[in-house]
Amino acid sequence: MPTDTITIFDTTLRDGEQSPGCSMKTAEKLEVASALVDLGVDVIEAGFPIASPGDFEAVQMVSRQFGDRATICGLARCRQEDVDRAWGALQDAERRRLHVFLATSSIHMEHKLKMDEKQIVKTAVEMVQRAADYCEDVEFSPEDAARTELDFLCEVVEKAIEAGATTINIPDTVGYATPAQFGSVFRHLKENVSNIGQAVLSAHCHNDLGLAVANSLAAVGEGARQVECTINGLGERAGNAALEEIVMALATRGDYFECDTRVNTDKLFPTSRLVSSITGMKVQRNKAIVGQNAFAHEAGIHQDGWLKEPTTYEIMRPEDVGVPGTDLVPVSYTHLTLPTILLV
């Protein structure tokens, strides 16, 4: 039986919107936010307030309308103006979180930031402290953590926790990690950061190698208790870990992970379709959990087994994820021979 509850951090309105062609108007973001609240996600990252006036307005409106039902989060670079702007958008929420990030990998420090390790640590500490002065719920992300030298990652994480970070999010920013390697990062942090018990460990994975969900679950296996994800796996480039896949993996394999979530799984399918309709990003037919074929059976042997006992070929029920009845999950006999049909 599950013994721990995983915090589901939804970033559809921030990272998901960064999918090319997926920008949303404020009214559309509010519609998605309402669906996410009904879905039961714990944290909604509503946007990047300093990015544009529209993003600021969206975070502010989501904070005002839903900040008493979910934790509303705003993203900020480790810059004073970013943190101040994010707080301005979030301050009306009853439950709010400031999420600050700073790259820590050698390639980002050298080529993007032009900063050395000492400067990175100093900046991270100062901006986490500034965020903590505003808000008791502060998340720190060492961007590109999956490609960061582990000893330096431990140093930055320890200093960020000392400065007031309550969640430490480990991003696989470019989708480079593999499950065993990504899990080992979490294990290393738990073994080498003296104050790691004072913060929640989180995973944020991109899908460039098709491993975002697998890497996130590997992190859960090594102690992550928050997973950052998006509806339908929307996100930069190849996308993020798909929320519906994370949630149903934990629900279906609770015997293995010994974890569950607070998500109302019967709202996964309608939420998926809402996001698809608003963004214009179609859900591929064979997409796990919410694809049109997810509960369809074509092979005659499979149909025969399903008709006798659905669990022979289905590890979850359509109604568990909100698929509205068998009309959307037809069992076709077109490939069954007459003798096979008569034997069913």
Question: Language model features by range: what are they?
Answer:
Residues 1-79:
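N-terminal capping/small domains of soluble enzymes
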Residues 8-11, 44-46, 70-76, 96, ...:
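Hydrophobic faces of well-ordered beta-strands that scaffold small-molecule active sites
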Residues 12-28, 77-78, 111-117, 141-151, ...:
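Active-site mouth loops of central-metabolism enzymes
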Residues 26-39, 80, 84-100, 104-110, ...:
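Alpha/beta enzyme core
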Residues 42-67, 105-113, 170-179, 237:
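Glycine-rich, proline-tolerant flexible connector loops at the mouths of alpha/beta enzymes
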Residues 224-239:
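Glycine-rich phosphate-binding active-site loops on the catalytic face of alpha/beta enzymes
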Residues 257-292:
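Phosphate/diphosphate-binding loops
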Residues 334-340:
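Conserved small/polar residues in nucleotide/adenosyl-binding loops
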